[in-house]
Regions:
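Amphipathic alpha-helical substructures
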Residues: 304, 423-508
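A surface-exposed beta-strand-loop module
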Residues: 71-148, 187-191, 231, 549-558, ...
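Acidic/His/Gly-enriched intrinsically disordered linker/tail segments
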Residues: 355-442
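Juxtacatalytic substrate-recognition/specificity segment
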Residues: 201, 258-358, 362-366, 573
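Surface-exposed beta-strand/loop patches in extracellular or lumenal glycoproteins
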Residues: 51-71, 186-206, 522-531
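Beta-strand-rich binding/interaction modules
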Residues: 75-77, 210-215, 223, 477, ...
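N-terminal, polar/Ser/Thr-rich
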Residues: 16-45, 74, 478-479, 483-484
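Extended, low-hydrophobicity, Ser/Thr/Pro/Gly-biased non-transmembrane segments
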Residues: 120-252
Length: 589
């Protein structure tokens, strides 16, 4: 009975400690990891040192370290002395397993604010296909595994970091994918804290007789170095391939690597790592990358790094882009389709930015421009509008949240803006609409000039890009950036209130003047195209309509119009159901 009581008291103390933890108190300022991978047994074994800095305002007695729930902590040491730590299973969807293996470390003495501590760590386990976090939400298993494809195996070894597999230690509060954007927001907040973190990981993979290659988004050599090591199963010597990942900051780059019998194909548009049997497909991808060079040359400065494509040897996996590196299966497809797939990674190689909305939005915007070259404006807008439905849904969900009725007020509009969101729908979808609307308002030349003069190191305030666009122009864009970038005021909601048709007196050509009044019932303003349709063609007039206001546009047309349509799809709006205004035919004289 006494022993049971002692255990109960200890467990209660552990629970109280865990509940009182500040899991975001410490920032890992440096990772120095040595990673051993045995593909045959799916095993990863990691040793290394972490430098932790207390970024909270209070002294800290406890530090938390989390890795994937498929990995286990084996030891934690401070100054060559093992420290006390408690293992804890922690449910969180930042890992594909839907859980984390957490170590709650008791430090010998409090670490003051700004103080640092070096911990030597040892952990390991297996990494196998797991999509628990998706399937428990009802996602079909096959579809879930296409997205959560990370694993260690002889046929296929590839791993992404935080947000997929926590193969390096992190510390975040518990988050669930069922809670809106909570997972993305938590990861974004962690990345913000780790912007200056140094990351070094030396990766060793037992290769046996196979010719393997380790490549990733920050590997220091093209394919790795061959060597030998002891076989963990037989004790004899066995081949080993080694490569390193080095990053100066984890703010936007997620440490990712893949292992296969890769060969390298260097091309003007991109460098490809592919398996030997995929040489024909690799050449198709290289040709598709080259096909993008004209649009890239027209819109952007030369590349500051080489765009890289790494084959995922499992054909059922979904592509994954991180910066200027694309991990993707090589599949047979038409050149235009491949070009669209490759264009974002090529843009990333030419145009880095500290703002994700600029990076992601520009990548998709140039995809739209590429589609326009083949399919004109109508085809481009159809491609652009593929993000419209999820964007509208995201805005409706935000408006439905408790306390969000006054979305247009500053307190709510400052939430989830393009400057602070981690939502891919906003970053890539809304971001691409912003670039397209700016192009429609300013023209190609002005936007291209702003992109050419953009310097990521000089982008130190939110208005930097706006100022580049306004440079030498008489146009004020403050209202636009305030509605679409600095604030999240939602979307416009246009309708044609009236169209007034008047013949020009004494004009033998029978030209008529059309005045169209447009109302915007939404919370964001926009300059929107108004299409005036006549039996002999159509005329477009652009009208700037601020939120909850009306504005008019005028145009002369050669014949009485039959219909007026506000918005051709270039401006995302909450409801396009009443954008058309039918004009009754004038009675015969």
């Amino acid at each position: 009975m006494k022993r049971w009581l002692t255990l109960f008291v200890c467990s209660l103390a552990m629970a109280c400690t865990a509940a009182a933890l500040d899991r975001e108190a410490f920032t890992v300022t440096r990772y120095q990891l040595d990673v051993q991978i045995d593909r045959a047994s799916h095993v990863m074994a990691v040793t290394g040192q972490l430098t932790l800095r207390n970024d909270s305002k209070s002294p800290q007695k406890y530090a938390t370290l989390q890795v994937s729930s498929s990995l286990s902590w084996n030891g934690i040491v401070l100054d060559r002395t093992p420290v006390e730590w408690i293992g804890n299973n922690y449910t969180s969807d930042i890992d594909h397993t839907g859980g984390l293996s957490e170590a709650i470390v008791t430090l010998p003495k409090d670490v003051p604010p700004g103080g640092t501590v070096n911990l030597d760590v040892q952990y390991g386990g297996t990494v196998t296909p797991d999509s628990t976090r998706l399937t428990r939400m009802g996602a079909p298993a096959e579809m879930a595994l296409r997205n959560d494809w990370d694993q260690i195996s002889e046929p296929f070894t590839a791993m992404r970091g935080l947000g997929y597999v926590a193969w390096y230690p992190v510390s975040l509060p518990a988050v669930s994918m069922s809670d809106g954007n909570a997972v993305f927001d938590a990861i974004g907040a962690w990345q913000f804290r780790q912007q200056r973190t140094e990351f070094d990981a030396r990766i060793h993979v037992i290769s046996g007789d196979a010719k393997l290659c380790i490549v990733g988004n920050a590997t220091t050599s093209s394919c790795g170095e061959m060597g030998g090591t002891e076989n963990p199963r037989t004790g004899g010597r066995v081949g080993q391939i080694t490569n390193s990942i080095h990053l100066n900051g984890l703010g936007q780059t997620i440490p990712t690597f893949s292992v296969a019998d890769y060969v390298q194909l260097e091309h003007s548009g991109a460098t490809l790592f592919h398996t030997p049997e995929k040489i024909s497909l690799a050449r198709d991808y290289a040709a598709a990358a080259e096909a993008n060079e004209s649009v890239l040359h027209e819109w952007l400065n030369p590349a500051v790094q080489v765009p890289t494509v790494i084959e995922l040897t499992d054909p059922n996996t979904s592509p994954y882009q991180n910066g200027a590196v694309l991990f993707t299966p090589l599949r047979q497809s038409e050149t235009p389709t491949l070009s669209l797939l490759l264009l974002p990674v090529q843009v990333a190689a030419r145009f880095p930015s500290p703002h994700r909305w600029i990076e992601d939005g520009l990548q998709r915007f140039l995809q739209v421009v590429s589609v326009e070259r083949r399919s004109r404006r109508k085809g481009a807008l159809q491609f652009l509008d593929e993000y419209l439905a999820p964007l509208v849904k995201a805005e409706e969900s935000a408006s439905a949240e408790p306390g969000s009725a006054a979305k247009s007020t500053d307190s709510h509009a400052a939430d989830d803006t393009l400057l602070n969101t981690s939502d891919e729908i906003l970053l890539r979808g809304k971001g691409s609409f912003v670039f397209w609307m700016l192009r429609d308002m300013m023209g190609d030349e002005a936007l291209q000039h702003a992109l050419a003069t953009y310097r990521p190191g000089a982008d130190l305030n939110p208005a930097y890009f706006q100022n580049l666009l306004q440079e030498g122009k008489k146009r004020d864009l403050e209202w636009f950036f305030d509605d679409w970038v600095y604030r999240n005021r939602g979307l416009p909601d246009f309708r044609v209130e009236n169209a007034y048709v008047r013949p020009l007196l004494g004009d033998p050509s029978k030209i008529v003047l059309v005045t169209v009044t447009v109302e915007n019932r939404g919370n964001a303003g926009a300059e929107v195209p108004v299409v005036i349709q006549t039996p002999s063609g159509e005329r477009v007039v652009r009208v700037l309509v601020r939120a909850h206001q009306k504005a008019s546009g005028r145009s002369q047309v050669p014949a009485p119009p039959t219909k007026v349509v506000v918005n051709d799809g270039s401006v995302p709006e909450i409801n396009s159901g009443d954008n058309t205004f039918e004009i009754p035919a004038s009675p015969a004289p």
